[in-house]
Amino acid sequence: MHNPDGSASPTADPGSELQTLGQAARRPPPPRAGHDAPRRTRPSARKPLSCFSRRPMPTREPPKTRGSRGHLHTHPPGPGPPLQGLAPRGLKTSAPRPPCQPQPGPHKAKTKKIVFEDELLSQALLGAKKPIGAIPKGHKPRPHPVPDYELKYPPVSSERERSRYVAVFQDQYGEFLELQHEVGCAQAKLRQLEALLSSLPPPQSQKEAQVAARVWREFEMKRMDPGFLDKQARCHYLKGKLRHLKTQIQKFDDQGDSEGSVYF
C-alpha cells in the first residue's frame, strides 16, 4: 500500500520497490492453493503485419562508368555495340553491323592478266577444231578382220611351196578376170542409167511422176541385186588374194637372187 506522502510502506517486500506499476500489473497473480487455474498466455510483443507500412524494394542501379571523353555510361563498355537510347545526348552512335558481315579491310588491288590478241585466236581455233576421224566417246571400234589368205599363205620358204603358190594364182586368175569383166560392165550400165535419170526434167503431170518413180525403183533393185553384190564381193576378194600371192612369190625370188649373186 502506498502512503499519501509517496513513501514506501515498511511492510512491503524490499525487492518490490524496484518494480514499476506497469510491471506489477502485467504479472499474473499466483495460483491459489487447491485450484488449478488455467495458464494465461503471454501476449506477443510483435505487432501485426498490418501495422507496418509497405515499403518498395530498393532497386539496384546499374554501375556507371566514364568513357574516354568523360561522359557517363549506364552500362560498362563491352564487346558489343552500345545500346540505342542509353547513349548520352550529343553523341552519335553508328548503326550496328550484323555479325555475319565481314569487317571492311584494306582494298587489295587484283593483278590483271595480259592476254594478246593472237593468243585468243589460237585458243578459239583449238576449241573449235576437232580431230578428223576421232573415235567417239564410249565407242569401241571393231577389230579389222584379217583375210584368210594372209594366214593360209605365209612367206614362201622353199621352191616346192613357191610352185604351189604359183598354181593357186594361175587357177584363180582366170576367174578373177571373168568376174572383173562382168562386174565392170554392170557398174558402167548402172552409172549411165543414174546419169540419165538425174538429167531428166521434173515431171509435168502425175503420169510422168509415176513413170519416173518406177524407173528409180528398178534402178535401185538392180544396184542392190543379191547376185550382183555377191559377184562384186567375190571379185574384190580374189583381187586381194592374187595380189598377196604375187607379193609372196616376188619376195622369195628377190631373196634367192640376193643370195646367189656375188659382189666383187
From Swiss-Prot:
GO biological process: bicellular tight junction assembly
Biased composition (Polar residues): 1-10
Bias (Pro residues) ranges: 96-105
Domain OCEL: 147-257
Record region (Disordered): 1-112
Pfam families tied to this protein: Occludin_ELL (PF07303)
Gene Ontology CC: one annotated term: apical plasma membrane
Family: Belongs to the ELL/occludin family.
Protein name from the UniProt record: Occludin/ELL domain-containing protein 1
Gene that this polypeptide is encoded by: OCEL1
